[in-house]
Amino acid sequence: MFDVTRVSADVGDGQISFETGKLAKQASGAVVVRSGDTMVLCTATVGNLRDVDFLPLTVDVEERMYAAGKIPGSFFRREGRSGEKATLTARMIDRPIRPLFPKGWHYETQLVAIPMSVDQVNPYDILAMNGASAALAISPVPVAAHVGAVRIGKHEGDFVVNPPEETHEELELDLIVAGTEEAILMVEAGASGVTEAEILDALDIAHAEIKKLCAAMEELQQKAGKEKLEVEAPQIDEALVEEIRASHGQALVDAIATEGKLERYEAIDKVKDEVVGHYAVPDEAGEVDEERVAEVKAAIDSIEKETIRKAIAVEKKRPDGRAQDEIRPIECEVDISPRVHGSALFTRGETQILSNVALGTTRMDMRIDTLGLQTTKRFWHHYNFPPFSVGEAGFMRGPKRRDIGHGALAERALVATIPDEESFPYVIRVVSETLESNGSSSMGSVCASSMALQAAGVPVTAPVAGVAMGLIKEGEDYIVLTDIAGVEDHLGDMDFKVAGTAEGITALQMDIKITGVTFDILRDALEQANKGRQFILGKMAEAIDGPREKLSVHAPAIESIKIDPEKIGAVIGKGGETIRALCEEFEAEIDVEDDGTVRIYAPTGELVDGAVSRINSMTKEAEIGDRYDSAKVVKTTTFGAFVELVKGTDGLLHISNVKPGERVDSVDDVLSAGDQIDVTVVEVDKERGRIGLRLSDDPSVAGKSPQELAAVGSGDGGRRNGG
């Protein structure tokens, strides 16, 4: 019934296998990829031919909680929309594969990855990336090459291929690389400040492993692949191209040189309209041949691309006139939004980002309960890209995949500098609003967010800046560009985003559209990016040169103290009575941990100080000389009165001291339960847990030092500690 084909590749210390012929046989290509007990079903399905001028490719990653033996926590106990992990994985599948589709491929195409089993040792993202390419390999889609993917970690100084998931939080470098047998196409990385040389070493290791995976996919295709569909690439009328170049070429060059993004686009569109009007003339009935219009538009687009690329790569002239390593003018400003806890505005050319910081209590941390190991986050970054940022009107219906990807990239860049919870017990959310965009908005959000964190008083270990690098390669001529603008990104061969501190790289994202990018070119790009990053850090320091010492007056006040774990009961009280009363009195949130750590959160510092003082008094060991005003009598006996000093701790006022200088036959003649009196500790017997008291206005007590009080004593007896 099943004609199963299975191949495998030894990658690092493990094995990745590809199997087809058993599951999802009606898909155009279906592969189960497996490592350990993690198993992902990946399918490639070819639909109908569409009358469009773009590649109709969609990539979906569908997490199923059963894969990890879990039940969804939603009301209906069913998975909803894709989470961040699934979205980021879908983007990592899409980005290296999309450039490999043939030009003119207009069949509806969908790639789907469904994790079927997750062992929480081997993450499913790497398997999904490999499985999607393997599914395409055996499908009718004539992609140009197979794409393999690996994760390279640096742990305790050593590079590790596909490190186990439990070590990911400890990695000095977490690098995901995708590529073909010939070249690297995509890189995603987060790091704690590694050097450019370490990145290149990791890429070299990754490519060697990728070649093994590509070989396995080729073997699978040879054994189980379907016949490929033939696609006729759209042909451009070269004669028409030359005619347009002769008649309107110079006008296009002049339009490209126009200053300002919107003005440049307007000038270019005007030339294009003139070209279409000249070469696609309406017939006698006033109708225009749409095929002719498409031919003319394709020709003028080809001339535009060739003109810009040749000017940059050969003539070393960028559209806005900058040198290859020149960064657009930068303006930095902090404290833009008065009520937020920290804000900063970063403007680089026509790209402008406003980042805002909100601080919260640790109760606001984010629980990550997906197919991987359950974790919590106390720092996250969100990125928004409203349509007005590029001068357009459009729908605003929540974050798109691109927004989620850019937010995650900036988060990786910044997280290495965030202080630990013990030294800064806050949850931190940063939101970057893209107000204008002409390229490199994700790196602009890194810069703005780093300044906003410092303005908020978050004690980051170092400021972080980011810069987007580009590449234009024409034959043997190439040029690496610093701080690419939108047109250079669109028409270029590489988008290489690098973020980091003055000391090293903390995040990296690279997408390469061609195969001829050598390690020498990558080395040049990294070195040039380092120079650009240092320059930007200098500009940021002019606006704010380090974290502020004080938090915003609008930020919640937080204090963390340690108490004796045996005193936790005194803070909590019977049935939580005491801690609830404290929270109400001081408008606070109070968290008590088993090790005696107590965190107090309140709207103001005064309220926090009051709560801290009260908790300290409740948990403090009584010492000779300590005075307790308005202490409550909790019980009277024939030999004295028990007085509550703090919750859980009583002392004894002996009958001989109930009324100084006078004999008392019965304590009840002087005191009753519920009375409030001022007492002073005059005796502490820790071995027997007894505390002896005298009235604070007793002449034998007033004005005495602890040593003198110890000599006075309590008269008789004492009282156990703990009531």
Regions found by a protein language model. Give the residues of each.
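Mobile "lid/hinge" segments at catalytic clefts and subdomain interfaces of large enzymes
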Residues: 140-259, 453-549
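Glycine-rich, flexible beta-strand/loop modules in the N-terminal catalytic cores of phosphate-handling
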Residues: 27-110, 115-122, 181, 188, ...
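Single-stranded RNA-binding regions, centering on S1/OB-family and related RNA-binding modules
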Residues: 556, 565-723
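Conserved phosphate/anionic-ligand binding catalytic regions in large, soluble enzymes, centered on
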Residues: 29-31, 39, 122-140, 334-357, ...
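Conserved glycine-bearing catalytic or ligand-binding loops at nucleotide- and phosphate-handling centers
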Residues: 53-62, 128-131, 288-294, 366-386, ...
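Long, basic N-terminal domains or extensions that often function
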Residues: 1-232
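Extended amphipathic alpha-helical scaffolds
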Residues: 1-46, 51, 58, 229-371, ...
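Flexible, glycine/charged-enriched surface loops at secondary-structure junctions
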Residues: 103-109, 144-146, 213-231, 262-263, ...
